[in-house]
Amino acid sequence: MAASRALSLTAEAVRAVIPRRSGRLLAVFPRLLTRWETTSSIPEAGEGQIRLTDSCVQRLLEITEGSEFLRLQVEGGGCSGFQYKFSLDTVINPDDRVFEQGGARVVVDSDSLAFVKGAQVDFSQELIRSSFQVLNNPQAQQGCSCGSSFSVKV
């Protein structure tokens, strides 16, 4: 039964492309549209936190200068439907949430926060690559082996 449900979700074309308040586009599966519209309100204090690992804090302190911070965004795409995007930024928008730990800051817009609340941001350094990653995301059903894309829980 689960396999047939997964197949029907995969077979459905992405029907809705919703303009985000920030001007970016996010593709959403039709059944998720209602769920995210009803549950993506601004989180209350203590709800929807993003945790930073020690290695994330350390790396951010090494690479950021002045008012720079790490921006985490969720976009439609990747092999699992959604993907994480990391960038350094200096502008905090009205709909952004700022998560600070040990002097390092990660900023997430309210639309993306619905997809990553409760997750952990880490910095991983390996022989073949070094990157920021989202770990232990309670909103993600599964991810791909690259670690940059995921599908959301329905």
Swiss-Prot record:
Heterotetramer; forms a dimer of dimers with IBA57. Interacts with [2Fe-2S]-ISCA2 forming the heterodimer [2Fe- 2S]-ISCA2-IBA57 complex; [2Fe-2S] cluster binding is absolutely required to promote the complex formation. This is Iron-sulfur cluster assembly 2 homolog, mitochondrial. InterPro entries: FeS_biogenesis, FeS_cluster_insertion, FeS_cluster_insertion_CS, HesB-like_dom_sf. GO terms for cellular component: mitochondrial [4Fe-4S] assembly complex; mitochondrion. Residues 1-8 form a transit peptide. Fe cation binds at residues 79, 144, 146. It comes from Mus musculus. It is found in: Mitochondrion. Gene3D superfamilies: HesB-like domain (2.60.300.12). GO terms for molecular function: identical protein binding; iron-sulfur cluster binding; metal ion binding. Involved in the maturation of mitochondrial 4Fe-4S proteins functioning late in the iron-sulfur cluster assembly pathway. May be involved in the binding of an intermediate of Fe/S cluster assembly. Keywords: Iron, Iron-sulfur, Metal-binding, Mitochondrion, Transit peptide. Belongs to the HesB/IscA family. One of its GO terms (biological process) is iron-sulfur cluster assembly. SUPFAM superfamilies: HesB-like domain.
